């Protein structure tokens, strides 16, 4: 679309494994393929817990500020995240302030005024979902410190030159959450990179071999976080057995694989995995097996009916999507949810909760089922696929066609490039709150002092 190659810097807090990370990686790869220069700046990047493109040299990644703590005695996560981002951005301002045409910022908007004030680049902020709606306020101190943080999120997000969101659902929640932001967010649906999903299954990979089974696979892919409601899939699966919804010999021929991002540094990941395992074994009497990335390769026992796969790799994902008879997507009010799109492209029918983003991606009774978040209702839906009330193969084919027409990476990259070109040539908006500028100046001074002391 343009002969000019843009220099684009992506700023992302923690470049691990998750839907937000998948989106920014795909965005970076897509823009890079169109001839633009791309680099990632992040506060944390673990080569053993990341997407392949950030590890194999496809994308340049620089880590800054990882020496700062992620929490203070297990608390104040958001404040530490903001401080880490300030340090990262301070280093950019000190040494690379004129290196980029566009900053693509997502998840955390605290750095936007700093970039706005001290660089000449335009800022595109991608809102996966308002952070103020994702946090719990269980204590008085949490309520007290979240109040200014929430206001800061609204003010700093509004300073962006362009705001994009991942769905119509998120756009609606954005307008309700940030009434002072008059800019209308543009909807940019997350894509999937078809090339990454068209790879053949590598059955010689040891991490794939341990997953091989004669059982039929029901698959759930979600981070091990309580808000993802993974137990919905587990309870629905167990109900098939407990309520005799299918014959015992039929149930014995199925395995539920609960796969997802898992970080041993995150207490909730550790605790939630333990809770799910206890629920499966102690309440439902199901045989389980857990696979960690660091654990030695060992075949899953043949009688294991629930397998927990923590932080799977690309080869394992390819295998599981190839083997799965049904994909179970459990979160409610999910802002978008890339997993159902991945499943549909792999020709796997999807069961998802009938709220949030999946309502915009899954076609009910055509590419899968949209159901209330009720284990018994989900169990009935799973049973209906097992007894072939629904034609899973046909639904899978329809799902693949649907994704090919609406969620391709080239279409996403074209749209994103057009937004960036328009943004780069636009006249900067200098209007802003003086209080926010003051916050930006103080933040930069504070970050620079810390950074210089550390050096």
Swiss-Prot record:
Main location: endoplasmic reticulum
Listed Pfam families: Glyco_transf_4, Glycos_transf_1
Enzyme Commission numbers on file: 2.4.1.132, 2.4.1.257
Top-level EC class as recorded in UniProt: transferase
Gene Ontology BP, a term: protein glycosylation
Glycosylation sites: 138
Keywords: Endoplasmic reticulum, Glycoprotein, Glycosyltransferase, Membrane, Transferase, Transmembrane, Transmembrane helix
Gene3D superfamilies with a match to the protein in the record: Glycogen Phosphorylase B
Protein name: Alpha-1,3/1,6-mannosyltransferase ALG2
Gene: ALG2
